[in-house]
């Protein structure tokens, strides 16, 4: 079991690094930091994969992975003299909930075309809320490390 989990984790990380690298190239990230964007995308997706494997739901796993991406991105930005968003935005994009959002929109189109049905409405609401919570978890998780690490005075 351990070896198959490790293989699945490495596969997940490698496949997540590809879109992170692609979006970093679309965002015109400097060439010297492209490997770090891919690595951070793979690490973040790998953390989410492990958290989900050990029983955490996808919303909380995405939140945890986004926090880790934010922390590593801030540390690397000081080391490589680049803005943290250079690393973090491209790294978090592979975790966006494309399937849930697509299923919700298809359900909306089917409701519009076929008429109301309780099953379609349930699918639409479930997938819309799931996608919304994942996007919210990613955005809040990505912003929290900056608030924690850059704050100079106490919050109270």
From Swiss-Prot:
It is a multi-pass membrane protein. Pfam families: ThrE_2. It is found in: Cell inner membrane. One of its GO terms (biological process) is succinate transport. The keyword Iron-sulfur does not apply. The chain crosses the membrane at residues 7-27, 54-74, 86-106, 128-148. Involved in succinate export with YjjP. Both proteins are required for export. Belongs to the ThrE exporter (TC 2.A.79) family. The transporter is composed of YjjB and YjjP. This is Probable succinate transporter subunit YjjB. It comes from Pectobacterium carotovorum subsp. carotovorum (strain PC1).
């Amino acid at each position: 079991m351990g070896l198959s989990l490790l293989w699945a984790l490495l596969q997940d990380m490698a496949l997540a690094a590809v879109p992170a690298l692609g979006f970093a190239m679309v965002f015109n990230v400097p060439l010297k930091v492209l490997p770090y964007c891919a690595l951070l995308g793979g690490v973040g997706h790998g953390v989410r994969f492990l958290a989900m494997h050990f029983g955490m739901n996808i919303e909380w796993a995405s939140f945890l992975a986004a926090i880790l991406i934010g922390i590593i991105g801030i540390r690397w930005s000081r080391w490589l003299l680049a803005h943290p968003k250079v690393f973090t935005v491209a790294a978090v994009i592979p975790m966006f909930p494309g399937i849930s959002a697509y299923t919700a929109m298809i359900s909306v189109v089917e409701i519009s075309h076929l008429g109301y049905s309780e099953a379609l409405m349930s699918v639409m609401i479930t997938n819309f809320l799931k996608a919304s919570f994942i996007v919210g978890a990613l955005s809040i998780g990505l912003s929290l490390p900056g608030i924690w690490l850059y704050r100079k005075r106490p919050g109270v």
